[in-house]
């Protein structure tokens, strides 16, 4: 699915917060990466973040 830059930032930020608070990491992370934002970006690039976006359909008048 294609996300806007704002949706992408929100997803990565929310997932990074979860990781920082102790949530389990879904992918195998290299030992040199310890920053939650970097881990969340890796998860986003691999399409494994367990967060979904519900987009409201546009209402035409």
Swiss-Prot record:
<dbReference type="GO" id="GO:0006360">
    <property type="term" value="P:transcription by RNA polymerase I"/>
</dbReference>
<comment type="function">
    <text>DNA-dependent RNA polymerase (RNAP) catalyzes the transcription of DNA into RNA using the four ribonucleoside triphosphates as substrates.</text>
</comment>
<keyword id="KW-0240">DNA-directed RNA polymerase</keyword>
<dbReference type="GO" id="GO:0006366">
    <property type="term" value="P:transcription by RNA polymerase II"/>
</dbReference>
<keyword id="KW-0548">Nucleotidyltransferase</keyword>
<dbReference type="InterPro" id="IPR020708">
    <property type="entry name" value="DNA-dir_RNA_polK_14-18kDa_CS"/>
</dbReference>
<protein>
    <recommendedName>
        <fullName>DNA-directed RNA polymerase subunit Rpo6</fullName>
        <ecNumber>2.7.7.6</ecNumber>
    </recommendedName>
</protein>
<dbReference type="GO" id="GO:0000428">
    <property type="term" value="C:DNA-directed RNA polymerase complex"/>
</dbReference>
<comment type="subunit">
    <text>Part of the RNA polymerase complex.</text>
</comment>
<dbReference type="Pfam" id="PF01192">
    <property type="entry name" value="RNA_pol_Rpb6"/>
</dbReference>
<dbReference type="InterPro" id="IPR006111">
    <property type="entry name" value="Rpo6/Rpb6"/>
</dbReference>
<dbReference type="GO" id="GO:0042797">
    <property type="term" value="P:tRNA transcription by RNA polymerase III"/>
</dbReference>
<dbReference type="InterPro" id="IPR036161">
    <property type="entry name" value="RPB6/omega-like_sf"/>
</dbReference>
<dbReference type="GO" id="GO:0003677">
    <property type="term" value="F:DNA binding"/>
</dbReference>
<keyword id="KW-0963">Cytoplasm</keyword>
<dbReference type="GO" id="GO:0003899">
    <property type="term" value="F:DNA-directed RNA polymerase activity"/>
</dbReference>
<dbReference type="InterPro" id="IPR006110">
    <property type="entry name" value="Pol_omega/Rpo6/RPB6"/>
</dbReference>
<dbReference type="GO" id="GO:0005737">
    <property type="term" value="C:cytoplasm"/>
</dbReference>
<comment type="similarity">
    <text>Belongs to the archaeal Rpo6/eukaryotic RPB6 RNA polymerase subunit family.</text>
</comment>
<keyword id="KW-0808">Transferase</keyword>
<keyword id="KW-0804">Transcription</keyword>
């Amino acid at each position: 699915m294609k996300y806007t830059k704002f949706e992408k930032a929100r997803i990565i930020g929310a997932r990074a917060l979860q990781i920082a608070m102790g949530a389990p990491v879904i992918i195998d992370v290299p030992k040199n990466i310890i920053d939650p934002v970097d881990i969340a970006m890796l998860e986003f690039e691999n399409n494994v973040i367990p967060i979904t976006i519900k987009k409201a359909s546009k209402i035409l008048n």
